[in-house]
Amino acid sequence: MNAILEKFVTDGYITGLQVLTPDDALLHRDHLERAEKDLSGSLHYLNKVHIILKSPFDLATHPKLLDAVESIIGPDILLYNCTFIIKEPKTATFVSW
């Protein structure tokens, strides 16, 4: 059993998976902020955002992420929905899990 699968089986979740470099993360944030400006509003909870924007699709299909998912569920992976859950700093909003 690989380490990712073992952690998932033991804990039920995975943390600390290094997928993006800091520069990659900034690039995707810039894409998000530009899209919010171009679309005149927040993308918070906008469903299937990966259909209209390339950046979320690139994130969801990043090889490092897909390798981790595949190690848990196998190679048959379907991206059905991609949604941004946005919590801006120093706001009264919250994200409940």
Predicted regions and their residues:
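Non-heme Fe(II)-dependent double-stranded beta-helix
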Residues: 1-97
